[in-house]
Amino acid sequence: MINYYTDKSFLIPENRKRVFPLLFQIHYLKNENIVAFYQVQNSIETANLVIVPLDIIYFFNTKTQKWLYNFIDEALKKDKKVWVYTSDDLGITLNRPVYTFRFGGFESKMNDKTIVMPSFLEDPYIHVLNKKFEIIPKLLMPKIGFVGQANGALITYFREFLIYLNYNFKILIKKHHSDYQPFYPIGFRRFSKLKKMENDTEIETDFIYRKKYRDGVKTSLQRQKSTVTFFENIFNNPYTFCMRGGGNFSVRFYEALIMGRIPVVLNTDIRLPFYKNMDWNIHCVLVSENNFLDEFKNFHKQCADLYFEKMQVENRNLGLKICNSESYFILIHHIFEDFNCNLNQFF
């Protein structure tokens, strides 16, 4: 049991979309399964954990950083662990020894107290496709799918650069608050990698290129059709190509996992969830930017047929566990009770 303290005055309907995800489960959804592992306290003194109630970017946007730092410093003075949550593609890092929950970032710049969260998803088999999970047998040639924004036009490169300059100018004048990241032309680089795979005669590809996010859909019917196309592509291919988006993480990675497929992940200095407590190499194919084709093909050649099928089953089970907010925070509870625990025992 973890006893935690938070400022409950922030847990109001208006803050529903910016609340710390664990607190959303407890205080908004009244999740009794979570309460068996986390118990709220009325004072810092009786707690062993202090949670900042809202996304910390909120305090910067509302110019209430002073409250944020005072709240954190009071907890640290009393030798309490502190959890903070930062949303957005980039997130923000505080100069305090706190545990930061975020969706992505750069492995080379993150400390041991940075906890990368997965994307929390509904099961696409139930909510989108109305299908059951099926294993795809291994074939001689690897087959990989992708549906998404990828554009090789030079105008796209320059447009992304202008967006990047504008975003960083807003950070400079403190109109926006987030960590800095170097320029990375996402659509342009995705297109380049996908084309290299398409041109390789030893790889079978099933790619659908979008010039805009979700193909620029405007109506709910178009959105529904676009969503079905996206998940059908993952369903039909044993491998899914996963590359970072606006932030240094891939939602598609978790979507492939929860569907029981094998993500081929371009390692752009990423950190995956539970990186200290589980071996991601048994769940995905991590490839380098410079040698991704050979690394992918070598994995497929060396992968035994039974292991290939077992990997899909285990990924499905893993995705259902970690992409669910309730079960994710139960796993986090186990880690904070025993930092050296091996999470494989829970899957």
Kindly label every feature range from the protein language model.
Residues 309-322:
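A short, well-ordered alpha-helix in the C-terminal region of glycosyltransferases
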Residues 237, 299-302, 318:
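Generic, well-ordered alpha-helical scaffold segments in large soluble proteins
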Residues 276-284:
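Acidic, glycine-centered active-site loop in nucleotide-sugar glycosyltransferases
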Residues 285-307:
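C-terminal "capping" alpha-helix adjacent to the active site of nucleotide-linked donor transferases
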Residues 252-253:
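Short glycine/serine-rich donor-binding loops of glycosyltransferases
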Residues 1-249, 259, 267-277, 308-309, ...:
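Nucleotide-sugar donor-binding catalytic core of glycosyltransferases
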Residues 263:
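Conserved phosphoryl-transfer motifs of two-component systems
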